[in-house]
Amino acid sequence: ISMDITSNQVWWAEFDTYKVGTARNSCSKMHTIHIKSFEPDDFSHEGIDAVGGNTKECFLNTLKELERLRILYNRTKDRIYWRAIIELLPSGYNLRATVTLNYAVARNQYHARKAHKLDEWVTYCAALERLPYAELITMEGKS
């Protein structure tokens, strides 16, 4: 199985616990974080939106500060600004990667994570259900 996935750093940290039978080729955050402006859509922020108020304001202020640091880094190339960006970056920042895994790993992930409290796992498991030969993953019809 090979697929492109865009998800937040929290989800990727959990995905990376599956090391055997997987490969991940990511777009490097370290080399590209300063290229484009920070926008709310670069982040998973559904929970922040649901809570609203000061939480939403804090998120938007963080984006403003990240953008200020990005501009300073691009202007000066001083790595202290780049380092501050990496340290301040919320874990909701979305990263894109191509993953390759076998059906055995997908089956393990599916059964361990299909009812997970992170919505991203539920979405991922739904994508696995749509794959050819998904019954090898879901084990539906097997006794």
Predicted regions and their residues:
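Family-specific signature for flavin-dependent thymidylate synthase
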Residues: I1-S143
